[in-house]
Amino acid sequence: MPTTDQPVVGLVLSGGGARSSFQIGALRYLYDTVGITPSVITGTSAGAILGTVIAQSADHEGQRARLAQLDEIWRQMRSSSDMFQELPWFARLRERGPVWLEAFDRRKRRQGALGRSFKRVADLRHGITAPADRTTATTEDAAVEAEEVTATVAAGVAAARPGTGTVARAEPAEPTESSWVPAKLLESIDTLRTVGRAGSDLEEIVEGAQRERSMFRPGPIVDRLLDPEVFEQAQVAESGITLRIAVVALESGELRFVTEQGTMVDRENRPLPEDPVDLVEAVKASCAIPMVFPPVRLGTENYVDGGVRESLPAAIAQDHLGVTECYAVVAGPSTGVAREDSYADKDMLSIVMRTTTMIMTDEVQRDEVVHAKASGAVVIEPEFDVHDTLTIESGLVAIAIDYGHLRAAEAHLGATAEEQAVTRDLIMLRREIWRAEEAAFAPHSATREDEERMRQVARISGMKFELRDLVRAVPADRLPEDGEQWWRSWEQHDFEIPIAPAWAPD
């Protein structure tokens, strides 16, 4: 731990999944304009990845070079599969979902709402079937029940990939069926197997879920970030940086921190009687969102995402590691969870991420942000999410990085409510422009006629002039280097836009 008389600079990075793009933008401002060189770094989940990579160097130039690597890797992501890779059992479940949905629809048309037989299957699930039912059930009854469970399983499956919407499905379920949510899915499949109608697909799904204990494995982005070319844990141990990675033990339920040496300490920085652990595994444990990624074994216990207990690990930095100048960068807003469209048809990952990384985290994070501010930290946080924890779109990632830069400038220099409103309107307008450009030019776009496309381009041109005025309302020292060019060009996309931006002068 640093012991000099100089200010002890600390950097605290929250969790946030794909939303860490905001943090990268904020860090660029802090390193390039403020000139920070933290000697203490703490992080949770995605923040643990960023912090651990930066912690390989103690000098400013070395840390800034690591940040440049993170920036490059983040901008190269193209889809949610870069961060979340489906396991075979879950991929099969998603593949078979539409078939089961169709069976459900046929059953509803033929027989109406699930009645007596649905109740019998529900009774079987809860182990409360009456003795008379058990002794008089026929093979035909079992077949009917199996078909109905198959259909009911389908009602709980959304076949969409993370962050891409949903596929067509049957009519919304009757109120009595609305409680059948993805959390009950595997239980339903197991019931189907019990009544003798499980095929190889269902066997693979059940056995895979029991064996893997998660729906996904970390995508290639994690391997890239932890590749020896980017990250070498020996450099962390030798750099002199004080590092704390937040993890939560499943067995004890306790919040722990892994240090730069791989040792384990409690929330008050007291050493625990555990052998040192591998730092790469500790980072993976800090990112192990329950159900999404499997728990990671560290020493004698299994660990999951540190955000389960502490999303913004500022308290240990400020109260126990001697930090006197603290910069805390939060990936998502702590002012409440924004309302989203209906989750009735969302896939399992979307529901888990919405509850664990947004709703639950918001409740915990509010108190942590209040504590950090009360203890004198400069807290940098967004007022809204440019994209959610699952969305990986290169254009939105770029906008979120720029938003982080602007918000860091506001936090550092101080900004009036009116100035913050300009930033908010500017970033929201860029997001709207990006969506309009996607609608007009993306290969999958519904826009086919040139005349319609030109009308959309005219609308985009008008929004670009609005963007120009907003950019000019932001003090120049708060803009990224290319900020004054934002209105002159197209936003970033994963495809080429075949026409030049006609609104921008040569």
Language-model segments: what does each one mean?
Residues 1-44, 52-506:
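Patatin-like phospholipase
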